[in-house]
Amino acid sequence: MNFLEDCISSIISNTKTNYEIIVVDNNSPDKSGDFFSKKYPHIKFVLNKKNVGVPAGLNIGIQHSLGKFVVLLNNDLIVMPNWLDNFLDAYKKFGDALYMPKSLKFNNPEILDGTGGMINIFGFGFARNKGIRDVGKYDEIEEVSYAAGTCMFVPKKIFDKIGLFDAKFFAYHEELDLGWRARLYGFKSYYIPKSLIHHYGSAHWQWSSQVFYFLERNRWLVLLKNYSLITIFKLFPSLILIELSMLVFFASKKILFKKIKSYFSIIRLLGHIKQQRKIIQQQRKISDNEIIQSFCGTIKIPLEANDSIINDKFEKFLSSLCKLSKYDKIVREA
């Protein structure tokens, strides 16, 4: 509960612009929603009877909001002075887009927690520059692949145009999917370094077989929904190699059943994928050629996972496979 209280206190202390706070409690086991709804009667608390998943919870918060803009926040962070004003200044300059702040480690603010979400051409997402020292090198506004869900500023009318988060994701990659989909509709994502947050970063999850199940399943949801069939066809040989390597990797960690489970889940979701593909591909304004320009030909594995779950060899393998898949050619011809 301390995370949520610190987060709320930082918003109240460091926000000058008119705002409302909406807290969505996904049936948390500590009943923090009940506690804080009594302590902060001026804050709107939505108490779900069950855990509906991260994206559905976010959607509920968005639907309860009354303003022109929404900021989606994890509860395990604090915002710094003028954080919201800096978002609004960026909006005045760049217009309708998705925005994210510079994120620093809560317990060591000299270390970056992320300077933008990056997407690998095979659908892997990661936080750029996570774990490196902040030496003033990343203090310029930049376009990124997607705005991380830790803290995301969005003009509400974007949701009216592209739809809300895909609730089928349940956990992980939902913001990657939103950022990709937004870009297809013509809305970019920006990293705004003057807007600062300090993120604890491990309050919600640990690396586990269940995490990898959702990451792998949702990676395929993203690919099948958002790429054109032509691009999927071009990437298909490399995607097969990725799958074979992932099967070997999961087997080596004795969690192969989770990878197999992800395939069955995708099969069950084919109707949903088909429905979403039809909407996205009919309404998209940006070609794969253009959107891939903001992707990267490599992947960086989070430091938290390097020692026990994924090693440098797999990271290098993915980068090599990007070259073998003729990434530059796909960019030119997609």
Where are the language model's segments positioned?
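Short, acidic, metal-binding catalytic loop of nucleotide-sugar glycosyltransferases
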Residues: S9-N18
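A conserved acidic beta->alpha catalytic loop
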Residues: S10, D25-D34, K50
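Glycine-rich, basic loop-to-helix element that forms the pyrophosphate-binding segment
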Residues: N48-S65, N75, N86
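Short aromatic/hydrophobic "clamp" motif used to bind/position activated sugar donors
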Residues: V70
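Conserved donor NDP-sugar-binding/catalytic core segment of glycosyltransferases
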Residues: L77-N120, F124
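A recurrent flexible, glycine/aromatic-enriched loop bordering the glycosyltransferase active site
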Residues: I111-L112, I121-F126, I132-V154, L176-L178, ...
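A short, conserved alpha-helix in the catalytic core of glycosyltransferases
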Residues: S145-L196
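Active-site-adjacent helix/loop segment of glycosyltransferases
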Residues: Y185-E304, N311-E315
